[in-house]
Amino acid sequence: MTLFDATRSFGGLDRLYGLGAAKAIRSAHVTVVGIGGVGSWCAEALARSGVGRLTLIDLDHVADSNINRQVHALSTTVGQAKVLAMKERIALINPECAVECIEDFVSPENWPAVLGRGALPDAVIDACDQVSAKLVIAHWAKSHKVPFVSVGAAGGKRFAHKVDVDDLSQVTHDPLLAQLRYRLRKHHGAPREGKKIGVLCVFSREAVAPPDASCAVEGDGTLNCHGYGSVVTVTATFGLCAVSAILNFLSDAFIKAKNNAII
């Protein structure tokens, strides 16, 4: 069995971000809320980027219907808790990554207590699909100045090249993030039209496609498809874009701190 060599495994990040920033990434703690079609790819990309500590939050279990778009969904993991399946996968990618699994759904009642005591994470990715959870996470992250990315809805989207990253004020074609924007403005005084809200989002500028007509009522009166369709090329792109933003946050924070120290 070959011993794990972090220097060789993550040397590409040293050359891309610089030794200091890459070290900051490897010492970072990132929380991912929702380990599904988008969040599982976030966790995968963070582990492959050498992030040293991850907190994964989700209560769902892997199902057959997840196999088309979720990286931890395999024939061997069906029925397993998503956070545990992801932890096992990460151990094979980056054995030095410390992974904490929290089997729960985030809600206004348990956030941020669900994180436990101790230092705040260095960054958070919200990849859940509940507006109430997205709202409490976004407001908390802004209040505590924690780098944060909120991910929109990937269902009903086919074109990966239309995925974008922008401030919440500029998001289009995403009912989930539109609700987040509305509630931040209504309940927390977020800036109105024309001004940045300060919440970075991953979303698609593609219009949501309804389920195909072939997924209509069967002859026996049952449906053969449920909800919006989805494809891994889009869900993975959402997740990778979110992680790209977080890695840049961490790198930029290191560079800023270094420059301030010189001054």
Regions of interest found by a model, annotated:
Residues 1-31, 64:
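N-terminal charged helix/coil linker that caps or initiates catalytic domains
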Residues 2-4, 116-123, 130-136, 143-144, ...:
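Glycine-rich phosphate/adenylate-binding loop
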Residues 32-34, 57:
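Conserved N-terminal Rossmann-fold NAD(P)-binding element of oxidoreductases
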Residues 38:
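Hydrophobic/small residue at the entry helix of a nucleotide-binding pocket
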Residues 51-94:
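Glycine-rich phosphate-binding loop and adjoining beta1-alpha1-beta2 segment
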Residues 62-65, 154-160:
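Short gly/pro/ser/thr-enriched loop/turn and capping motifs at secondary-structure boundaries
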Residues 102-111:
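Conserved SAM/SAH-binding loop
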